[in-house]
Structures are given as structure tokens and as C-alpha cells.
């Protein structure tokens, strides 16, 4: 293990954030003096970031916590093009209105992890639409494009993998790495930025930006990537059978976010405590040694600490209490995720397949609902569903005015009268 001088590099190394660094000694020296200005770019392809983005956000947090300056770069410009990295097909082109709406929805996430302001290490937020949308095409080709080798661009994973699979790569996507590289140069000129961070799939684009900066006469630029995380079983972080694990509370309830972390595989608990919480390392080492049933205590701490960072301590504690009430005490917690239904719907009767598939999304389809019923996996008010033609009516309402639907032991939704 490399011995670094700076707190920033030591924290990243001890917690498992470092995958590749372009010039470790030079970057370490800058960080030791509090002179690193680093950015991570986030394209606005959805109304929320997801758990897969958390690694880079946590790196921005630790950068600031160790006295250096973070920049959160909104991809208002690059989203109009679409990043081909890790994609098997061309991204859907969003309207400018959709991009702007997504950008506004995403912005609030960062203030949970970093402090914005005018101080030395205070974070700033930038938007590459500010300079990319003003580029003149001919000038871009002359001043920027001449520094890029098509031969080298064709060797980049984001391009090469698509071509090797004989999958279409549009000209607009091919230009993405040029725009990302120019972002680095522009941030260097405007804000003295000297480091770009990102996932390991971005290494090629980032070092291309480092090279462009050298060719265009900026100060020395640096690259640092974190691993692309998968779980111990090989699943991609941030994805579940039900879809993406969103960070915005209006797209994924804090309770469901808590449950995502609570369901962490045993082999991942120690690693995730290092990456996704602010707990001190000695406490993490203690929790990582727990075995058998005791490891569930570590999982609850992981879930509560990760949820507190994203949604606040009150929401995290409420989620933990809801889980305890639901699973350990056998109750129907009012803080479970809920879906409103009308009195008219209930009076007419709601088919159990519709309730589980369409109303609550506990299952993906009517077919899956039927399979779960046969396997004994669906329950209404804690009673197994045995008849796929069952209809929910007002008689199924509890004294609290809700109907509890469950799939397995850990997925629950309440139907609540509007």
C-alpha cells in the first residue's frame, strides 16, 4: 500500500476509493497543501442520480473534508450528446426542456454531501452548457479537434467495444470524449481545476482531457478513478430487479432506500461501510468482524448511516423504526410506502393481480403475480393469497384504514384511501 502525505489520498486509499491515478506523487503534493480543485461531471439523463453515482459524490465529500475544493459539474451541454461509455446502444436524445428539468431535480443531492459557498474549500456548481453551447463548430475543429487522433479515439473502450460488437455508434456520441476533454480545460481556465475524478469506465476520457490540457497550455492536470462497484455476487451497484435505486426521495422513498442497504450481502458489509458512510475506520473494523446473526446489526447500521447522509437522520431513524415494527414486531407500520386508492375503486373491488402489479408495482406483471401466488409469496394483511381471482374490498381495510400488501418478507406497500 502506497504511503501518501496528504489526508485526502490516505482517506481515499484506506476506504477503497482508488482505482487509477495519473501522477500519484504530484497529486498527493497538491492535496497536502490544500491546492486540489477537483470535479466530477454528472449528465442529466434522469430526474435523479442513483446509488451508482454515490462513489464519486463521496469522493467529493472527502476532498472537501480534507481541505480541498470540489466542483459538481452539471452536464447541461454533454447530455445533449450522450455518453456512449458502458452502453450497448445509442442513448435516447432528450429535449432541452427535459434536460433542464432533470438538472434542476438533481442539483439538491449535492448539498447533502458537500457545502457550497465562497470559501477556500467550499464547493461550486458549474454547468458545461455555459461554454459548450457557445462553441462555433469551425473554431472547435481548429482549436480543439486538431489535438485528437482518430486512431487513438478508436482504441477507447467506449468506442472500441461498440464497434467490436458491430453495434451502431453515432457521430454525435463519437464526439462526446472531445466535449468531456474540453470541459476539463475550461474548468482549469475558469476555476484552476487540476483534477477530474470518475468511475473506472471514464479513465480513457479523463486522461484524454489531461492530454488536451497539456496541448492547450494549461497547468498540469490529473486523473483519478474509483472502481466500478459490483456486489459480491456480481450484480451492478444501483440496480435491482425493480429498477434503479434513485437518490431523490420523490422517486424512491427513504424507507425503500434504507431497505436497499439493509439487504446488502454479508461479504459486502465492511466494504460498503467504508465507501458509503462517514463512520470512523476503527468502528468499521469492529463491525466488519461480526459474524453469523450479529452481522445483521452491522447491516442495520450501514442502512441507517447511508440513509441519514442522503435523507437526513430523522428519515433514517424513522425507516429503521418502521422496519423493526414491520419485521420484528409483526405490526403494520404507518410509515411503510403507500399508494392511494379511491373509495369508488374499493367499492367496485380491486383484483389482487391488479393490486400487486399495477397499483403497487410489488411485482412486474400479472404473470409474475400468478407465479408468486402459486409459490406462496404474496400476502394481503399478512395472510397468504391463494386465489388469483381474489378481490380487495372495503372489508379488507384495517382499523387504521389501510390494506397491507406484501411480497416475501421484506417488500411491503400499504393501499390507503385517498
Curated annotation (Swiss-Prot):
Residues the record lists as binding ATP: 239
E.C. numbers: 6.1.1.1
UniProt-annotated location(s): Cytoplasm
Chain ranges for the short sequence motif 'HIGH' region as given in the UniProt record: 44-53
Keyword terms: Aminoacyl-tRNA synthetase, ATP-binding, Cytoplasm, Ligase, Nucleotide-binding, Protein biosynthesis, RNA-binding
Membrane as UniProt keyword: no
Subunit and interaction comment: Homodimer.
Protein name (Swiss-Prot/TrEMBL): Tyrosine--tRNA ligase
Gene: tyrS
Amino acid at each position: 500500500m502506497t504511503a501518501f502525505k496528504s489526508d485526502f489520498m490516505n482517506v481515499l486509499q484506506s476506504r477503497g476509493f482508488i482505482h487509477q491515478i495519473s501522477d500519484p506523487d504530484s497529486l498527493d503534493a497538491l492535496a497536502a497543501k490544500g491546492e486540489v480543485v477537483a470535479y466530477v461531471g454528472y449528465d442529466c439523463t434522469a430526474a435523479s442520480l442513483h446509488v451508482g453515482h454515490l462513489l464519486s459524490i463521496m469522493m467529493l465529500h472527502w476532498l472537501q473534508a480534507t481541505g480541498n475544493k470540489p466542483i459538481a459539474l452539471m452536464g447541461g451541454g454533454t447530455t445533449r450528446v450522450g455518453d456512449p461509455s458502458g452502453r450497448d446502444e445509442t442513448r435516447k436524445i432528450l429535449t432541452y426542456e427535459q434536460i433542464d428539468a432533470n438538472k434542476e431535480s438533481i442539483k439538491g443531492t449535492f448539498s447533502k454531501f458537500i457545502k457550497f459557498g465562497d470559501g477556500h474549500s467550499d464547493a461550486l456548481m458549474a454547468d458545461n452548457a455555459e461554454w459548450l453551447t457557445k462553441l462555433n463548430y469551425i473554431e472547435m475543429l481548429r482549436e480543439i479537434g486538431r489535438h485528437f487522433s482518430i486512431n487513438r479515439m478508436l482504441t477507447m473502450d467506449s468506442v472500441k467495444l461498440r464497434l467490436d460488437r458491430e453495434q451502431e455508434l453515432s457521430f454525435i456520441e463519437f464526439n462526446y470524449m472531445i466535449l468531456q476533454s474540453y470541459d476539463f480545460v475550461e474548468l482549469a481556465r475558469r476555476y484552476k481545476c487540476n483534477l477530474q475524478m470518475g468511475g473506472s469506465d471514464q479513465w480513457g476520457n479523463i486522461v484524454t482531457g489531461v492530454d488536451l490540457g497539456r496541448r492547450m497550455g494549461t497547468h498540469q492536470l490529473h486523473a483519478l478513478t474509483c472502481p466500478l462497484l459490483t456486489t459480491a455476487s456480481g450484480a451492478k451497484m444501483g440496480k435491482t430487479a425493480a429498477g434503479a435505486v434513485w437518490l431523490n426521495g420523490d422517486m424512491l422513498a427513504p424507507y425503500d432506500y434504507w431497505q436497499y442497504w439493509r439487504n446488502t450481502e454479508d461479504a459486502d458489509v465492511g466494504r460498503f461501510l467504508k465507501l458509503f458512510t462517514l463512520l470512523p475506520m476503527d468502528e468499521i473494523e469492529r463491525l466488519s468482524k461480526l459474524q453469523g446473526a450479529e452481522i445483521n446489526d452491522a447491516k442495520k447500521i450501514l442502512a441507517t448511516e447511508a440513509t441519514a447522509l442522503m435523507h437526513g437522520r430523522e428519515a433514517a431513524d424513522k425507516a429503521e423504526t418502521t422496519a423493526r415494527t414491520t419485521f420484528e414486531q409483526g405490526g403494520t407500520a404507518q410509515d411503510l410506502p403507500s399508494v392511494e386508492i379511491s373509495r369508488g375503486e374499493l367499492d367496485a373491488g380491486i383484483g389482487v393481480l391488479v393490486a400487486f402489479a399495477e397499483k403497487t408495482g410489488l411485482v412486474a406483471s400479472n404473470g409474475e403475480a400468478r407465479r408468486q401466488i402459486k409459490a406462496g409469496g404474496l400476502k394481503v394483511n399478512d395472510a397468504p393469497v391463494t386465489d388469483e381471482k381474489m378481490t380487495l374490498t372495503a372489508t379488507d381495510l384495517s382499523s387504521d384504514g389501510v390494506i397491507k400488501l406484501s411480497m416475501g418478507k421484506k417488500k411491503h406497500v400499504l393501499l390507503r384511501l385517498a
